[in-house]
């Protein structure tokens, strides 16, 4: 059996590109992309992706263990499954990305950039996901969980971001995030160029980006911290009932504004080490620059993904408001 992660790290593409066993058939679609289809009927088609940012290793390790357990029959495959390691070159070098953030390349975003290995990869991943869903059972419900870890610490360590879509968010998706003991869920207010927005908007999948702690090198992750999300992913693959939640109720936030860096003098009014979900009160200055300041207009708001070092014209953070319980 070819190991999923090893095939990427060693750049050794499997000799057999497809095959089957007693339970399912499998086909390698690309480097770090494999499709598994059970012999019996199924009601769900699920994409699990990690490594869109190459230094976010814990989710990659989770997918490797799931891959091994499915092939060893210690995890029963009762759904059609596409496993994706997103950015092989960045995974091999331990970098977030090589030239440009791949999670801003989807929904055709790669077309606005100079061609590179990563733009080509983003385009192919879009194609693989579309083909995966189109070739699956027409009545199967579609899901996509894109797994990440964050650059900075967070007051709410684990959270999901749901793309802004026209259709209502799927109840099973929301229930699975709750069962995974995530601390929070964030609802976007505008379209994006993320992998999960692509699968939601272009493939009609119930999709989410999951942030599961902080990025660490391979071998330095404490996977015991990811037991809850791992359990839920395995339950989804086996198509079994979701487990109960074991934490305080999940908190819900909505994005009310994006902070855009427009000028060279742009500054955020918080320390560089400030965690995600840092709090601002009404009247607080969140960010300053010559052309526009950002001030908290609500009683309490929080900031997500603050980054003063982005290029001009890019998002330097999200302003969140907590939704009523």
UniProtKB/Swiss-Prot annotation:
<dbReference type="GO" id="GO:0019545">
    <property type="term" value="P:arginine catabolic process to succinate"/>
</dbReference>
<protein>
    <recommendedName>
        <fullName>Succinylglutamate desuccinylase</fullName>
        <ecNumber>3.5.1.96</ecNumber>
    </recommendedName>
</protein>
<keyword id="KW-0056">Arginine metabolism</keyword>
<dbReference type="InterPro" id="IPR016681">
    <property type="entry name" value="SuccinylGlu_desuccinylase"/>
</dbReference>
<dbReference type="Pfam" id="PF24827">
    <property type="entry name" value="AstE_AspA_cat"/>
</dbReference>
<dbReference type="GO" id="GO:0008270">
    <property type="term" value="F:zinc ion binding"/>
</dbReference>
<feature type="binding site">
    <location>
        <position position="148"/>
    </location>
    <ligand>
        <name>Zn(2+)</name>
    </ligand>
</feature>
<keyword id="KW-0479">Metal-binding</keyword>
<feature type="binding site">
    <location>
        <position position="56"/>
    </location>
    <ligand>
        <name>Zn(2+)</name>
    </ligand>
</feature>
<keyword id="KW-0378">Hydrolase</keyword>
<comment type="pathway">
    <text>Amino-acid degradation; L-arginine degradation via AST pathway; L-glutamate and succinate from L-arginine: step 5/5.</text>
</comment>
<feature type="active site">
    <location>
        <position position="211"/>
    </location>
</feature>
<dbReference type="InterPro" id="IPR007036">
    <property type="entry name" value="Aste_AspA_hybrid_dom"/>
</dbReference>
<dbReference type="Pfam" id="PF04952">
    <property type="entry name" value="AstE_AspA_hybrid"/>
</dbReference>
<dbReference type="InterPro" id="IPR050178">
    <property type="entry name" value="AspA/AstE_fam"/>
</dbReference>
<comment type="function">
    <text>Transforms N(2)-succinylglutamate into succinate and glutamate.</text>
</comment>
<keyword id="KW-0862">Zinc</keyword>
<dbReference type="InterPro" id="IPR055438">
    <property type="entry name" value="AstE_AspA_cat"/>
</dbReference>
<dbReference type="GO" id="GO:0009017">
    <property type="term" value="F:succinylglutamate desuccinylase activity"/>
</dbReference>
<comment type="similarity">
    <text>Belongs to the AspA/AstE family. Succinylglutamate desuccinylase subfamily.</text>
</comment>
<dbReference type="GO" id="GO:0019544">
    <property type="term" value="P:arginine catabolic process to glutamate"/>
</dbReference>
<feature type="binding site">
    <location>
        <position position="53"/>
    </location>
    <ligand>
        <name>Zn(2+)</name>
    </ligand>
</feature>
<dbReference type="GO" id="GO:0016788">
    <property type="term" value="F:hydrolase activity, acting on ester bonds"/>
</dbReference>
């Amino acid at each position: 059996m070819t190991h999923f992660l090893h095939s990427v790290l060693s750049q050794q593409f499997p000799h057999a590109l497809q095959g089957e066993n007693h339970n399912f058939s499998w086909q390698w679609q690309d480097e770090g992309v494999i499709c598994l289809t059970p012999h019996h009927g199924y009601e769900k088609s699920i994409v699990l992706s990690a490594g869109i940012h190459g230094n976010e290793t814990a989710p990659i390790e989770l997918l490797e263990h799931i891959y091994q357990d499915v092939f060893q029959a210690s995890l029963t495959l009762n759904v059609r499954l596409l496993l994706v390691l997103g950015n092989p070159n960045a995974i091999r070098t331990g970098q977030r990305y090589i030239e440009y953030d791949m999670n801003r390349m989807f929904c055709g975003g790669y077309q606005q950039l100079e061609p590179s290995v990563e733009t080509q990869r983003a385009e192919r991943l879009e194609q693989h996901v579309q083909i995966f869903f189109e070739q699956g059972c027409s009545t199967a419900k579609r899901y996509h969980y894109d797994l990440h870890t964050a650059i900075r610490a967070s007051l709410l360590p684990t959270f999901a971001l749901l793309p802004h879509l026209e259709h209502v968010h799927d109840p099973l998706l929301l229930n699975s995030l709750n069962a995974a003991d995530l601390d929070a869920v964030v609802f976007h207010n505008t379209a994006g160029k993320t992998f999960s927005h692509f699968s939601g908007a272009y493939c009609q999948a119930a999709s989410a980006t999951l942030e599961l702690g902080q990025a660490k090198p391979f071998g330095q992750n404490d996977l015991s911290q990811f037991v809850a999300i791992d359990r839920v992913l395995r339950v989804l693959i086996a198509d079994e009932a979701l487990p109960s939640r074991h934490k305080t109720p999940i908190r819900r936030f909505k994005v009310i504004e994006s902070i855009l860096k427009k000028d060279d003098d742009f500054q955020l009014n918080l320390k560089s080490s400030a965690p995600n979900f840092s709090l601002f009160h009404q009247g607080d200055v969140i960010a300053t620059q010559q052309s526009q300041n950002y001030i908290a207009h609500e009683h309490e708001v929080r900031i997500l993904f603050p980054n003063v070092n982005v290029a001009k014209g890019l998002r330097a953070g999200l302003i969140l408001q907590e939704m009523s319980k």
